[in-house]
Amino acid sequence: MKRRDFLKTAALAAGAGWIGSAAAQEVGVKPRLHFFSKPLQWLGYDALAETVAQAGLGGIDLSVRPKGHVEPEKVEQDLPRAVEAARKQGLKVEMMVTAITSAEEPFAERVLKTAAQCGVKVYRMGYLRYDDALGVEGSIDKNRKQMAALETLNKKCGIVGCYQNHFVW
């Protein structure tokens, strides 16, 4: 086995091999799991899709952000190529990860519009800084207008934004 093949297999096995087998037996339906593309960013779109399909997963959660699988500056050219590569392997691309935290960001509308046109339904937003001095309610208030503007853009583009709480040590 080549080193590259071993690394692909090991990366996928770490997160995919055991997930869902008990649930699939219990309900008789195989869950459709999407693989977050970050661990395999060094692969091109075709190799990524082939690897994820070989692992038995149902889709790809693409990173569409600076230094991601798709760079925001090239989203109109590259995201359709990435999605097509996935579809050729029978995979879905219904979700993506971005660095978007504001509707005013230079590539926000282009990324969201292109993603929706490619069939992406939801995206994970970038992270907001928690302010210890403001606390939870104050931090929410601080970001309320920014999130409202992003919600308006999401509706315009036909996509749903999701936020992940992510603690930084």
Task: Give residue ranges: language-model regions.
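N-terminal secretory signal peptides
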Residues: 1-2
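Active-site acidic/histidine proton-transfer and metal-coordination neighborhood
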Residues: 10-16, 47-50, 66, 92, ...
